[in-house]
């Protein structure tokens, strides 16, 4: 959620920055609402002052033996009018807040301007894609040959875009998550968290999934015994970031760095016909998430650090990748700046996204009222939040199967994973 000063006092600047990401801000409507708000605010305050002043005169009139009935009637009328104005003002503020909740974050000035993913900017590559002297198989063929990817059973049990993993491939999937968690906690300084896979509406509002992305969620019915509606998490970013909702932290507590391995659930609304084969786009998938809570002046450095942490996973696994900075037109709703890391997939002969790391600045913190108390002035100020995939486990499995495949259909286990696989050097 943007600072309301941008929607009140800096409308032209805000409109220009949002236009760069393809969002049209109706500033005429906002100006009209703001004028109405000011008018109602003044009217409410004047009515309150008049009512208070006249109420005080009742006692004086009584002491003089005067009939106070007319004054009482006047106070009653003012009270009725005041209540009506308060209701009108509350409804207007709710309308303004709803608009504010639907406005995306302002892109950082360092973000390249562009209309869509074709204008994202590659900033570096690592590793050389392997040259094969045999026909390359995709992960679906490899997984089915190895007896480890069972799409038919998943369709029977649940439906499309789900998977049953078995044997060595299931073990590698588990090993990858453990490897990533160990790397982030031991080498990168994160604290591991185990979090709920179900979250309430306040949590989804806090991180920006609601109200805009309600169609992407799997919602549970009926509500809980507390009467709360719950949804399956689309990413661990939601429960982990909400750990600091409605909290005032000490400056000494920052930065907070948390990692969590969870299943994630997405309806993939709008993705009909995309990546229908294999593990690339599933309704349920595992991901190791990284979240940082930092002071505002440190958030851009923290973003670069987080990208490096995600890249380090791929380096240790020996998987070629490239890193791109997203242009204004391709960024997510809450992001001020985003880097995507794309891993090389030989069967597709291209790079595919395996991690997205974003600096959200104070966009989520304002929604969540996540603050810290500065040592300098002891006043609460909004933190900055960052999130990133470290990595998507299923897509990492896909990359290993395809990049480490052999001519006989076996798959070499990357050296970094072997301690997590009981020393196994090869699948198949």
From Swiss-Prot:
It holds the Pfam family tRNA-synt_2b. GO terms for biological process: selenocysteine biosynthetic process; seryl-tRNA aminoacylation. Coiled coil: none annotated. One of its GO terms (molecular function) is ATP binding. ATP binds at residues 266-268, 353-356. It is an enzyme of class 6 (ligase). CDD domains: SerRS_core. Belongs to the class-II aminoacyl-tRNA synthetase family. Type-1 seryl-tRNA synthetase subfamily. This is Serine--tRNA ligase. It comes from Shewanella amazonensis (strain ATCC BAA-1098 / SB2B). The gene is serS.
């Amino acid at each position: 959620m943007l600072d309301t000063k941008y929607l009140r006092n800096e409308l032209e600047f805000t409109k220009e920055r949002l236009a760069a990401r393809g969002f049209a801000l109706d500033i005429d409507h906002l100006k009209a609402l703001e004028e109405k708000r000011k008018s109602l605010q003044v009217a409410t305050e004047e009515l309150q002052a008049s009512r208070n002043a006249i109420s005080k005169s009742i006692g004086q009139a009584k002491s003089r033996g005067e009939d106070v009935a007319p004054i009482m009637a006047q106070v009653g009328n003012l009270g009725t009018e005041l209540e009506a104005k308060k209701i009108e003002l509350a409804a207007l503020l709710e309308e303004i807040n709803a608009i504010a909740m639907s406005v995306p974050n302002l892109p950082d000035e360092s973000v390249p301007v562009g209309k869509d993913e074709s204008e994202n900017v590659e900033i570096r590559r690592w590793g050389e894609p392997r040259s094969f002297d045999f026909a390359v198989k995709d992960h679906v063929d490899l997984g089915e040959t190895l007896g480890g990817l069972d799409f038919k059973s998943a369709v029977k049990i649940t439906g499309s875009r789900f998977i049953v993993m078995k044997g060595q491939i299931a073990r590698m999937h588990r090993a990858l998550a453990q490897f990533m968690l160990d790397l982030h906690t031991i080498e990168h300084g994160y604290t591991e968290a185990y979090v709920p896979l179900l979250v309430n509406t306040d949590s989804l509002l806090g991180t920006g999934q609601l109200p805009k992305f309600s169609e992407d969620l799997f919602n549970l019915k009926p509500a809980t015994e507390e009467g709360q509606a719950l949804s399956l998490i689309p990413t661990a970013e939601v429960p982990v970031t909400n750990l600091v909702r409605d909290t005032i932290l000490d400056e000494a507590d920052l930065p907070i760095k948390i990692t969590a391995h969870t299943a994630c659930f997405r309806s993939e609304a709008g993705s009909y016909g995309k990546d229908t084969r294999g593990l690339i786009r599933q309704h349920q998938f595992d991901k190791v998430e990284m979240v940082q809570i930092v002071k505002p002046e440190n958030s851009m450095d923290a973003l670069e650090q987080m990208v490096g942490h995600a890249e380090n996973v791929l380096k240790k696994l020996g998987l070629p990748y490239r890193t791109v900075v997203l242009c204004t037109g391709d960024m997510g709703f809450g992001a001020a700046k985003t880097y995507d890391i794309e891993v090389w997939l030989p069967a597709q002969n291209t790079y595919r996204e395996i991690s997205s790391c974003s600096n959200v600045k104070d966009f989520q913190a304002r929604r969540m009222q996540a603050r810290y108390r500065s040592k300098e002035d002891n006043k609460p100020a909004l933190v900055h939040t960052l999130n990133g995939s470290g990595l998507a486990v299923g897509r990492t499995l896909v990359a290993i199967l395809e990049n480490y495949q052999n001519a006989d259909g076996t798959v070499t286990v990357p050296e970094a994973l072997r301690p997590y696989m009981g020393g196994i050097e090869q699948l198949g």
